[in-house]
């Protein structure tokens, strides 16, 4: 894969794994983050082989020097549900966003075409990992995650850094007319700027 580094991201190839990191978040050594890239050495498909999935997590954990046992992986179902993580042993179902102020906990969300948001408040030391598919986006999961950071931890929205991970582009995203009509046309004029029929 070619080098994807640019003015906002760094493309890392290390120990047989590839991932990107946001330069803005790299300014804060107290946190770690990454967005893994699809390649022959990593496979994070939720419906794939469990052993391959576990091996992929081990590889990325080794590369980042994080404890695999401290990863919190929700069962995502394209909701607008955001939960606060207080322990790495917690399990979450029907949750697409996680936030925490606890140290040594890794938040993990999965996405293929969907958008992932990485949030960080360097003042309150709160992190967030949000899976924002089109359903969650229409339900404003990003906004709800920020609100939960405010309500639970007293974050100031002006302090929150939001990095938007790679995702499907408008030119490749097709939905059936019935879905477009019932979901997108009912929204504000903003949707007409972003989507076309």
Regions found by a protein language model. Give the residues of each.
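Active-site microenvironment for binding and transforming phosphate-containing groups
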Residues: 1-197
